[in-house]
Amino acid sequence: MKNLILIACFFITFSAKAQNLSLTKIWETNELPVPESVLVSTGQHTLYVSLIDGAGNIKDGLGGIAILNADGTIKDRNWVKGLHAPKGMAIYNNILYVADLDVVYGIDTASANIIKTIKVPDAVFLNDIAINSRGIVFVSDTRTNKIHRIENNESAVYLDNVKAANGLKFINEQLYVLSDSQLLLIGHQKNRKLIAEGLEKSGDGLEVLKNGDFIVSCWAGIIYHIKPDGTKHKLLDVQGKMNTADIAYDARKRILYVPTFNGNSVVAYQVNFN
């Protein structure tokens, strides 16, 4: 009997470790002009969506931020207007930080007013944002291959030679970054540890699951499930049909939100743990 219990426990453990994911589409919201990034606001049960509404590298004043309800209905299409090419977002102390080409905006979530405009010297294509527990902002520049650090509204280069630096995420006070076709962990001494490599296209959005696995999107239309040991498989491959830009994940609901960029929509997928 004891042996049977041990065998059963082995298979349960093996199954958990071998667990794969799949996606089931829940809803899609259209008529969102060039959505680049989605951010879950758990307290308000809403989604922030950065809208480029034009070219991703031009200061044209067409960009903005929309708010969706949790069911995908549009709460406020024009919550913030007059930005250029807004991309990655993060919230700290009720301030929404938004990367926009060469500046980072701080937007008061209660009033929708821009209360901070932080210039990032020599920046060209600021892309994603992550904020640590101390409120220090980190922002990637995909074109200059750098990660910048913003503290007390002052910007400085934190790390350079990070090829096509894009998606950022703090996990247990450690910074992870998508660098071209790789997922890297940046140590406290700025040493780099390779977590995964061989992404078919350059990485864009980065999210983490409760079990420590990652979900990674590639702008070209691929979404991966990546395990801490670097093994990966495709959850979605829609290349040539739509983009999969800077994703967001609601761990409580197990829902993945995907901005489709040129598809002008946001798609919600249920994440199934098989």
Predicted regions and their residues:
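Bacterial Sec-dependent N-terminal signal peptides
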Residues: 1-23
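A short beta-strand motif characteristic of beta-propeller blades
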Residues: 22-29, 73-80, 113-119, 154-160, ...
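Beta-rich, blade/repeat-based domains predominating
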Residues: 32-44, 61-62, 80-94, 121-137, ...
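Residue-level marker for isolated small/hydroxyl-bearing positions within beta-strands
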Residues: 50, 99, 140, 178, ...
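Beta-propeller domains
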Residues: 50-72
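Short glycine/acidic-enriched loop and turn motifs that connect beta-strands
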Residues: 53-57, 103, 144-145, 182-184, ...
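Short loop/turn segments that connect beta-strands within beta-propeller blades
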Residues: 68-72, 108-113, 150-154, 187-191, ...
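Hydrophobic alpha-helical segments and helix pairs
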Residues: 95-150
